[in-house]
Every structure is written in structure tokens, then in C-alpha cells.
Curated annotation (Swiss-Prot):
Biological role stated in the UniProt entry: Flagellar radial spokes contribute to the regulation of dynein arm activity and thus the pattern of flagellar bending. They consist of a thin stalk, which is attached to the a subfiber of the outer doublet microtubule, and a bulbous head, which is attached to the stalk and appears to interact with the projections from the central pair of microtubules.
Record's GO cellular component terms: cytoplasm; cytoskeleton; membrane; motile cilium
Localization: Cytoplasm, Cytoskeleton, Flagellum axoneme
Keyword Cytoplasm: yes
Keywords assigned: Cell projection, Cilium, Cytoplasm, Cytoskeleton, Flagellum, Methylation, Repeat
Modification note: Asymmetrically dimethylated at Arg-243 and Arg-428 during flagellum resorption. Probably methylated by PRMT1.
InterPro entries cross-referenced by the UniProt entry: MORN (IPR003409)
Region span, Disordered: 283-346, 739-769
Keyword Repeat annotated: yes
Protein name according to UniProt: Flagellar radial spoke protein 1
Length: 814
């Protein structure tokens, strides 16, 4: 990448910057271009990003924020565009840095190399009609791998000349411009130290704090609280106490239609943090009217009362002989002009209330919680609401005193004594997310779901996926079947151990008479930014959407069907799912973890297992093959817990069609199955034995032949077996017949639902272990027969171990 340096026209009306990353409209990529502004003091002055589409009082505007663009804006093409209007700039802003970033998506590789195309485009024009329009290829930078942010370019303003644009091209693994503030400052220093650019901002930066960051939270951002608190640190920092700050602001009231008309009152917004259990039932809540619950409370602690010195109000008395404005001979004074209207910050955080969560003290049954801000005035809704916003703040190590409070003054004084510019701040902002409302656009909105907090259990399907270290769920199910089986069996064993540990803890608690108050299952708390608008006059009116919110993590739209390729679902019985949803059901590649320890990885269609898949059962049995409507159907292989294996055709979950079954005695049974039972001609073989005969519902019935190869001695060395083997024999064949009670093998009649009707007059079919009613008849004496080959070609590949191989020419060969 080679960009500049070159000076942009000083009197230009508009500069445009954009990134292009979509090769086709179908590509589901979520890259964005941000701009970070630094002032002459080297301080971060303002930011522009997807959730803050205007900055510097409209001098920077995101392309999608159409109503904030001046009428004369010349629109440019681009997947994400920033418009800059230099004539609106404040003089204190000296440096702008442009950052391309790809937000991380849990369960999906999503970095700047995920697209086959990545370009940075610049265009401008001046009053003389001079124009510039050029794009620069960023793809070689992203191809390094693991690149989630690129500091693309820097612009700086010098005393002589206009804005100068220069390429940077620094790549970073962090997915947000807010996490690379130290690198942004270093870029400013590099302008001075490496390129000789004289900037006040560079001279003002005395030291760079490697932990400095600003929260840039995107919609549907999903992250564990511990990871968010750690930021760039390698080890997560446990969050034990969380503060949720709430803010909302309003549009100015419309002008009165009649003289003397009182302006309307501000809407009375309320909030509700509803906590749910795994069944979707409300456990408790914190709201405007309900200020306290287990492990949670609303409102800041009462501040200490300041001891104020009593001061007498001094009134100025006019001196003798001085005339007041109404005094005799005095000239009437003009009233002073009204002060200018204060500048309105559209992104002001106006704290309305706070919620404290003592995370370890929350009720164990709480699985998730949803934060909503409501105004159930269905006539006006959110018409007057400008912003609704919340901040998640880690206060595990304490809180910063409120500005202007006695504690803040004392902290500042203590910091000054230590030579610090400001007192240390023990708080960490984990997320700052809000919804911007356009005036009168949201009349139908009466409630906004801002944020979700939820437990992610260690044994979830998502964590099984993460343990594989693959890019996405399609890559997970595309692994070798044996690899998937090992991963699912590891989940099964972990589930068994966890259940045993829970049972032991419950027994110990019962014996000691203590109550288990903590959640016994290992988990982490995560947050997910929502920003979803709903109507209705109560929470009950959006019950369906709320169920989706607390049990589903993926892209959501109010009232719409679930549709996401990286969704996570939890179910009341403890099952979890990670994979694709379409039209509100599981569809596409997915991974399902049963609470029993069973697991499935494969394709779904219409909400059911359908297509190729791998499944591990609670007893350790495994299936690899085809599914239809949640059942085995097509070709597949089932390994039973005892080690035996069936490979062949299935229908409706049963063996049906041609197949091969290897048992634990290293024998091979071949034939045709119907509804799980062997029927018609079948062959069973061992190294020294072959049985060929007719079967009825799994029982031998009809003519048969036993073939015995007496000289195959498995416990003798290979050379000995080869030495004693003759060209043929002694191998004998015995024609015979088996019989079963008449009528016992008839197919049962079925009822309307397809279930067999019990027939008390029908004789029972012989069955294991006694096989009562089964008869055997030798048809004639044994006769010599050719040697047999084992294992049979039709039984290969052999799916079990330690099976010897015999051939006619060489004897025991393995």
C-alpha cells in the first residue's frame, strides 16, 4: 500500500474515505471504517464509528447517516464511507486516524482476511473543480492472517498548508479501534520521529499508557465479562461486581401551536432488568419501582453529607446619592441579551439510574437477564426519545468518585500530592451501547431491549466447538468422523464427571444440612448488545420475542424468524445447540450437545437432523452416516458400546436393507435387514466357521449349510500354520435345516398409527437366551468342501480390531 503523503485542497468542500470489501451482495461481512480524532494536546477528542455515525459537530459523518449529510453532499460509492467537511472543523483537532476493522463473531472466523477484496478509497474535489479519486489495495496487509484492525491512514493539519494524508498500514489482532489507542498515539509520534512532521499533538504526548482504551460496542457484540475486563491482557480478569449505568435523552419539544401553551412534559421512561431461569420463567427483576433483589440493587449509595459552612448572604446596598435604575434621573437599562443556547451533544450520557450486580450472589437458577427501557404510552411511544443507552462497568476493584463530589475532590488532592495528573480509576467500562432514535420515527416503539447478560456453561455445544479450534461450524462437521467422535466422547466423559461431582456435592450438602446456593456447573457470564425495538403495552405483549432473547444468541429482528449462521440456543432440559438457523428452525450445519452427554454434529433441515452426521450416545455408542428427520436413514455405521459394528442401510432409525454386522467374537454377519431384523438369505462367518441359511425376523428358519475349516488354529504361530496347511481341507460342509413354530415369524398387523397389534394366539418367536421352539435337523452327513477365505470380501473394510486373515494359498496371513 502506497498512499501519500499529499496535501488535500485546503478549500475543499468535501473529502470522502471508504472501504470496499464485498465481492458480491450475498457476502455477509461486517467490516467498518472508523475515524479517531486527536486534539493539539495529544488527547483523544472524538470518535466516529458504526454506533456513533457523526462526530465533531457534523464535520465527520458516516455515509449511512443520510439525514446528517448536507444537501450539497456528493455521494460516493463504497461499502462503508466517511464524509469529511473541512470547513466545519474545530481548530483544536489536529490529527485524524482511519481504522478498518472486522468485529469478532463468536463461532466464526471474521477478520479482515475473510473477504477476497479489501480496498481503501479516497476522493475529493475543490472549488476549482480539481478532483481526485483513487483506491488502494489493503488485501496484502490482511493476508498476514489474524488481522482484525488496520490503521489505514493518518491525516494531520499543519500551520502551513491544508490537511495532509499519509498511509500507515499497521496491522493488529484487536477487533476494535477502541483497543488500539496506544498504537494510534504511537502513530502520531512516528509522524514526528520518523517523518519530521511537527505536530503539537506529538509534542504533548509524554507517555503512552498501554492499557488505555475506549469502548466501541457494536450491535450483537458478544463477549464474556472477564475477557472484556481484561481487554488486551492475556489472562481474563474475573468480574465479581458489575454496575449498569442507564441514560436516555430527549428531543426538544415541538413549538407550541397556541400562545401560552405549556410545553409537553418529558416522557416518563422506566427500565426493567428481568432475570430468567432455564425454563424461561422470571426469577426476579430490578426496575424503576423495584429497587432491590438477591445479588442486585438499583441506585448509587447515598453520598456523605458535606459539612457546609454557614454563609450569610450579602446584599449590596446602594450608596448614598446613587440612583437605581428606577431612581430619579436614572436612564432605563436595556435587558442583557439572552445567553446563547448551549450546544447539544447528541451522544451525551445523562445518567438516570444505575444497577449494581454482585455476580457471585445472584440466585443460582438465574440463567440469563434482559435489560429493557420502556414507555408504555402507545400514543407517543418513543417519539420524543433521542437516545437510550447503557454502560456495563466492572467495579470489582472499587468505583471512581462522582465528579464534583467531596470524594472526588479528596482523590484529586491525593493524586496531586503524588505528582499524578489524575487519580487512578479502578473502574473498567466493558461495554457502552445505545440506540439512536430519529424524531417521530419510533412512535410505534414502546420498549427497547438494550442488553442481555447470560451464563455460558463449560459443557455447552459452543464450547465443544471452540475446543476444536476450527473456523466455523461447517469446518467442525467437515472434520474426519473419528476426530468428531473423539471430541463428542470427551464431552460425554466431562458430562459424566460433572454429574458425579454434582451428585457428591448434593449428598454432602444433605448430610451437613447446608443449602447449595451457587450454581454447581462451571460457567462464565457474557454480555450481548441487542438494540431491538418492540411495541406493545407490557412485557407479556412481546413474550415470544423475549423467549428468543433469553434462549437464543444470534442475529435477531423484532417479530422476525431466527436466521443466523452462528447461533447458540439453550433449552429447558439443559440441551444446547450451536450452528445455523433459517426460518426460525435449525437448518444447515450444527452441533447439538444433549444434557445426557450425547452429542450430534452434522447437517440439519427444517429443525431436524437431516443429511450427513456423526452422533455419540450416552452409552458410548456411535453412528456415522445419513439422517432423515432425526432418524438414521440411508447409509451409515453404528458402533455398539460392546464393540460390535453394523455397516449398511438404514430406514426410519432401524437397520433396513443390505448390511454387514461384526460381533465381539470377530464374526461377520451379512444379509438383508427389514425393520431391524435379518430376513431372507444370510451368512455368518468366523475364521473356521461359515453359516449360510434362511432367516425369518432375525431367526434361522429353513435350509442352511455349516462349513467348518478345522485346521485354522489361531493360537499357533504363522509359520506353523502355513507348514501344516494342505492344499485343501480338512474342510467339511454340513447341509441342515432350522425350524420355528408355525406362524411365529409372520409380520404383525399394524394399527392406524403404524404400531403392531398384539396377537395372543400367535406363538412366540424363539429368542435369546433359550431360543425355545427353535429346531435343528441335519439333512445329510458332512462332506468335503473347498477352503474359505476370511474375512470375506463383502465384509471389508473390517471395522473392528484383532481380526485374523486367512487365504486359501497362504493360510494365516495376519
Amino acid at each position: 500500500m502506497a498512499l501519500g503523503p499529499f496535501v488535500l485542497p485546503f478549500r475543499g468542500d468535501q473529502y470522502s474515505f471508504g472501504i470496499n470489501f464485498k465481492s458480491s451482495p450475498e457476502e455477509k461481512l461486517n467490516f467498518d471504517l472508523s475515524c479517531v480524532a486527536f486534539d493539539v494536546k495529544g488527547q483523544l477528542h472524538d470518535t466516529l464509528h458504526a454506533r456513533k455515525p457523526t462526530a465533531l459537530d457534523g464535520a465527520l459523518v458516516k455515509g449511512f447517516e443520510k439525514q446528517a449529510l448536507p444537501e450539497e453532499t456528493v455521494q460516493v460509492e463504497g461499502d462503508d464511507v466517511i464524509y469529511m467537511f473541512p470547513k466545519k472543523f474545530e481548530r483544536q483537532v489536529e490529527v485524524l486516524l482511519f481504522v478498518a476493522s472486522a468485529p469478532s463473531i463468536p463461532g466464526k472466523k471474521h477478520d479482515l482476511d475473510s473477504s477476497s477484496k479489501l480496498e481503501f478509497a479516497v476522493s475529493y474535489s475543490d472549488v476549482g473543480g480539481q478532483a481526485f479519486n483513487q483506491s488502494f489495495d489493503l488485501k496484502p496487509l490482511a493476508a498476514q492472517g489474524g488481522v482484525s484492525s488496520i490503521i489505514v491512514a493518518v491525516m494531520y493539519l499543519q500551520a502551513e498548508g491544508g490537511w495532509t494524508l499519509r498511509s500507515v498500514g499497521d496491522c493488529h489482532p484487536f477487533d476494535s479501534p477502541g483497543l488500539i489507542v496506544p498504537e494510534l498515539k504511537q502513530t502520531i509520534l512516528n509522524l514526528r520521529d520518523h517523518h519530521g512532521v511537527q505536530l503539537d499533538a506529538a509534542d504533548a504526548i509524554q507517555a503512552i499508557d498501554p492499557a488505555e482504551r475506549v469502548p466501541v460496542t457494536r450491535q450483537f457484540q458478544d463477549q464474556s465479562l472477564d475477557e472484556a475486563s481484561a481487554g488486551r491482557a492475556a489472562e481474563p480478569a474475573p468480574v465479581k461486581k458489575l454496575r449498569i449505568d442507564l441514560s436516555w435523552t430527549f428531543w426538544p419539544p415541538p413549538p407550541p401551536t397556541e400562545e401560552g401553551e405549556e410545553p409537553p412534559e418529558e416522557p416518563a421512561l422506566e427500565y426493567n432488568l428481568v432475570m430468567y431461569n432455564k425454563d424461561g420463567e422470571e426469577v426476579q427483576s430490578i426496575s424503576t419501582g423495584n429497587r432491590e433483589a438477591t445479588g442486585a440493587r438499583a441506585g448509587r449509595p447515598e453520598p456523605e453529607e458535606d459539612e457546609e459552612e454557614e454563609k450569610e448572604e450579602e446584599k449590596e446596598e446602594p450608596e448614598e446619592g446613587e440612583e437605581g435604575e428606577e431612581g430619579e434621573g436614572g436612564e432605563p437599562k436595556e435587558p442583557p441579551p439572552p445567553p446563547p443556547a448551549p450546544k447539544v451533544d447528541p451522544y451525551e450520557f445523562k445518567e438516570r439510574d444505575v444497577i449494581y450486580l454482585d455476580v457471585p450472589d445472584l440466585p443460582a437458577e438465574v440463567r440469563s437477564m434482559v435489560l429493557l427501557v420502556t414507555n408504555y404510552d402507545e400514543e407517543n411511544g418513543f417519539t420524543r426519545v433521542r437516545t437510550v443507552r447503557c454502560r456495563l462497568v466492572d467495579v470489582s476493584n472499587g468505583e471512581a468518585p462522582l465528579p464534583g463530589s467531596k470524594a472526588a475532590v479528596a482523590a484529586a488532592a491525593a493524586a496531586a500530592e503524588q505528582g499524578l495528573a489524575a487519580p487512578p480509576n479502578p473502574e473498567r467500562v466493558l461495554a457502552d451501547y445505545g440506540v439512536l432514535s430519529k424524531y417521530e420515527d419510533d412512535k410505534a416503539t414502546t420498549q427497547v431491549a438494550l442488553m442481555k447478560l447470560y451464563k455460558e456453561y463449560a459443557d455447552s455445544a459452543f464450547n465443544v466447538f471452540r475446543g476444536a479450534g476450527v473456523d466455523n461450524v461447517a469446518a467442525f462437521i467437515g472434520q474426519e468422523p473419528d476426530t468428531i467422535i473423539n471430541q463428542l466422547k470427551a464431552y460425554l466423559e466431562a458430562t459424566k464427571k460433572q454429574k458425579a461431582a454434582e451428585a457428591a456435592a448434593a449428598a454432602a450438602a444433605e448430610e451437613s444440612g447446608e443449602e447449595i446456593t451457587a450454581d454447581p456447573k462451571p460457567h462464565v457470564w457474557r454480555f450481548r448488545a441487542l438494540g431491538l425495538n418492540f411495541g406493545g403495552d407490557s412485557l407479556e405483549a412481546i413474550e415470544h420475542d423475549l423467549k428468543n432473547l433469553f434462549a437464543f444468541d444470534g442475529d435477531l429482528a423484532p417479530g422476525a424468524a431466527r436466521d443466523s449462521d452462528t447461533s447458540r440456543s439453550s433449552f429447558p432440559n439443559g440441551d444446547t445447540y450451536f450452528g445455523s438457523y433459517a426460518d426460525d428452525v435449525k437448518h444447515g450445519p450444527g452441533l447439538y450437545a444433549f444434557a445426557t452427554g450425547a452429542g450430534y454434529a452434522g447437517e440439519y433441515a427444517g429443525g431436524k437432523r437431516h443429511g450427513r452426521g456423526v452422533m455419540v450416545f450416552p452409552d458410548g455408542g456411535t453412528y456415522v452416516g445419513e439422517f432423515v428427520a432425526d432418524k438414521f436413514e440411508g447409509q451409515g455405521q453404528y458402533r455398539y458400546p460392546d464393540g460390535s459394528v453394523y455397516t449398511g442401510s438404514w430406514a426410519a432409525g432401524q437397520k433396513h436393507g443390505p448390511g454387514v454386522y461384526w460381533d465381539t467374537a470377530r464374526g461377520c454377519l451379512r444379509g438383508e435387514w427389514k425393520k431391524g431384523l435379518l430376513v431372507g438369505k444370510g451368512t455368518y462367518e468366523q475364521p473356521a466357521l461359515r453359516f449360510e441359511g434362511e432367516f425369518v425376523r432375525g431367526m434361522p428358519a429353513g435350509t442352511a449349510t455349516y462349513t467348518l475349516t478345522g485346521h485354522r488354529t489361531l493360537d499357533m504361530p504363522c509359520f506353523a500354520a502355513q507348514h501344516i496347511q494342505a492344499e485343501e481341507g480338512p474342510t467339511l460342509a454340513l447341509p441342515c435345516a432350522y425350524g420355528i413354530p408355525p406362524g411365529s415369524g409372520d409380520e404383525p398387523q399394524l394399527d392406524e398409527e403404524g404400531q403392531p397389534i398384539e396377537d395372543t394366539d400367535k406363538p412366540p418367536l424363539p429368542a435369546h437366551p433359550k431360543y425355545e421352539g427353535l429346531t435343528f435337523t441335519a439333512e445329510q452327513l458332512p462332506g468335503a468342501a473347498p477352503d474359505t477365505v476370511f474375512p470375506p470380501e463383502e465384509g471389508k473394510p473390517v471395522p473392528i480390531t484383532a481380526v485374523p486373515a486367512f487365504s486359501v494359498s497362504t493360510g494365516l496371513v495376519a
